[in-house]
Amino acid sequence: MKILMVTPYVPYPPASGGQIRTLNLLKYLSRKNDIYLVSLYKHEDEKRHIEFLTKYCKEIHLCKRPEKPWQLKNILTAIFTSKPFLIVRNFSEDAKSTIKDLLKRVQFDVIHSETFYVMPHIPKTHVPTLLVEQTIEYKVYKHFVDGLPFFIRPFIFIDVLKLRHWERYYWNQATLVATVSNHDKELIKEEVSDINTAVIPNGAGDEMFEKTIKHRNTIDPVLLFLGNFFWLQNMEAAQFTIKKILPQLEKKMQNFKIVIAGQQAKKINTTNSKVQIVEIEEDNADKVKKLYQTSTLFIAPIFGPGGTRLKILAAMAAGLPVISTSVGIEGLNIKDNQHVLVANNKEQFVEKVLLALSNQKLYQDLQNNSYELALKKYNWKNISEELEQVYKNVKKHDENRN
């Protein structure tokens, strides 16, 4: 098949969840299909990644979008038009004209739009379109707004309402909408009942899977939280770990360390000697893997909605037991006390940490069960095959509709 894939980021290096997802899909889809990639970029040095991506793509087109989102032009456009800020700051005239030219020149089988907010670049066309929602964006932003001081909320909430309107609008424009979980699929169905939907889950990178499950140090445990701290949910989780979980743990344990790692981790301030902040460069996959390999537990106090968490899938693939909130594991086909331990407040997190460290059988069961599930359900080879079938269904559905 000839696939036109449009992404709001350059999918290399695999620094964010979206980039990890797209790169792994490209890796496997390119074996049987011709992929024409159109990606938005902010900084000129991102163009150097074209060389790496060439092996997966028939053509690559990088299109400039605003380097700094908070430009006066963007702010005024978001305030005085019907478009939400997310669409405004991700819009590129270059991408719009590039896609228009590609559609004239190449006979595509399907257009793959990764996120709804790149859909404005795609003109009216007879080519069937698959819109992939990595998360329900307006719900993510609503969660953020709900945490703001009450006197600020009304001003920002207007943008959330616009976001919801346009997200729903582009769901209706697509031939089929795919989500990363059944949970998000049901949320879309609640909003617009007659939308055609499918589920294309996230996965764990091939490099994260251990060949054998290793014994971990439970005597002097290392508790890891890893994420990209550009995202609000990860900052929220880091602060909860330091301010809520850590003081409770210190009352119960002595020899332990908390590692908070990721891009922009340096934004996190703490003077507690038990917390180690580790900055990870965007292309340093080896450091990420080593942290997963050398930690004892992965703690994920995530309270923001949407998507599925690649960080949790990576921990499962690495044989690292996970303690997370109910929200954190939403959309994943995993069970409490079988694949992970669920904790929804600071007391429960401490309780589950102590339980996992003191019960060797439970610890090993969590390792083995989550690893086997990741291997079976959350590997990118199988996921890409599911996506190929969805492409065929999109094409068939469009033919029947016409």
Q: Where in this protein do the model-derived segments appear?
A:
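Acceptor-binding helix/loop patch of EC 2.4 sugar-transfer enzymes
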Residues: 72-85, 130-165
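Donor nucleotide-sugar binding/catalytic pocket of nucleotide-sugar-dependent glycosyltransferases
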Residues: 62, 157-160, 168-211
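N-terminal subdomain of nucleotide-sugar transferases
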Residues: 1-62, 248
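Acidic donor-binding loop of glycosyltransferase active sites
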Residues: 175, 290-307, 318-321
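Conserved acidic donor-binding segment of nucleotide-sugar-dependent glycosyltransferases
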Residues: 340-347, 355-361
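Conserved catalytic-core segment of nucleotide-activated headgroup transferases in glycan assembly
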Residues: 201-211, 216-294
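A short, well-ordered alpha-helix in the C-terminal region of glycosyltransferases
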Residues: 355, 362-377, 386-389
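Short hydrophobic beta-strand element within catalytic cores of glycosyltransferases
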Residues: 311-314, 321-325
